[in-house]
């Protein structure tokens, strides 16, 4: 005896197929490691480009960032996945021993490099924020100057580790 056709089961399979085709692949994450701890973070900004290599849409989520505790002068290791897409760079903010906030950035990595160690720039400096940037496009800033804008970012907020008291 042949089983009867079940419309409910067929509808369920169709719905599952629609869901499977409408799902997007997970976006690549970046891993930060320092002070014997690691944390992975999803992109906080992810823009797609149109056929003319101009930004067609962006998903920005300011809650997509990670925290890591580092002490003054401690380095930070950064690992990016192979599908991140070269080129990429690391932008960072730090406070010097006097408490003055400054910023800097790494070189632009275009050679398939997947890891970078960020050394704090000077004795007594405390890293406070690190951002991996990728997917650069040519654009204009508010003053009309030509800039390369990142279309993908991953953010780490660094919590200062209290000094060890002996």
Name these PLM-found stretches:
Residues 1-10:
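Bacterial N-terminal signal peptides that target proteins for export
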Residues 11-16:
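Hydrophobic membrane-insertion alpha-helices, especially the h-region
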Residues 71-84:
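Beta-strand cores of secreted/periplasmic/IMS beta-sandwich domains, seen most often
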Residues 77-79, 89-166:
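Extracytosolic low-complexity repeat regions of secreted or lipid-anchored proteins
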